[in-house]
């Protein structure tokens, strides 16, 4: 059975009440790298008001995710062509079914396996996020991928 975005939205909780469910940052270096990324993007697009940058915020995308708390949000994500306003989280069903256009994960020893495996597959197969990058602030490992015909192809790394 398929349903429209409006039917799906009517089944979901009010997004204004869904606060981000993200854990604390891994380290002060992790925080500094994330702050630098956000600052650079906001400065680069300082005269625009048609984007949203989420940092350490949950992306709510399904009822199962809400019920099982099975997914932690990206370290950083960007959504283009949307209204720039404060949000407590990104709630897909209240944003017209929109998923992030860009995701960046900052790797750590405790998250690298998930960021390179299950999260990459989720961003590719479910979110269909056009570009995905990861960076390890300690080892300086950098990799980037662009969605091409439904599959991430390396563009960096």
Segments and roles (model prediction):
Residues 1-157:
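Gly/Pro/Ser/Thr-rich low-complexity, intrinsically disordered segments predominantly at protein N-termini
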């Amino acid at each position: 059975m398929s349903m429209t975005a409006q039917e799906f939205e009517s089944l979901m909780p009010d997004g204004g009440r869904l606060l981000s469910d993200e854990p604390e940052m891994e380290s002060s270096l992790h925080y500094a790298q994330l702050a630098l990324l956000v600052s650079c993007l906001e400065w680069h697009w300082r005269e625009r008001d048609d984007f949203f940058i989420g940092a350490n915020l949950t992306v709510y995308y399904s009822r199962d995710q809400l019920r099982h708390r099975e997914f932690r949000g990206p370290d950083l994500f960007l959504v283009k062509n949307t209204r720039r306003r404060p949000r407590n989280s990104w709630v897909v069903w209240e944003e017209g079914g929109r998923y992030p256009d860009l995701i960046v994960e900052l790797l750590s020893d405790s998250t690298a396996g998930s960021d390179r495996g299950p999260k990459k597959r989720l961003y590719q197969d479910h979110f269909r996020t056009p570009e995905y990058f990861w960076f390890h602030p300690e080892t300086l490992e950098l990799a980037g991928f662009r969605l091409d015909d439904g599959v991430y192809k390396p563009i960096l790394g």
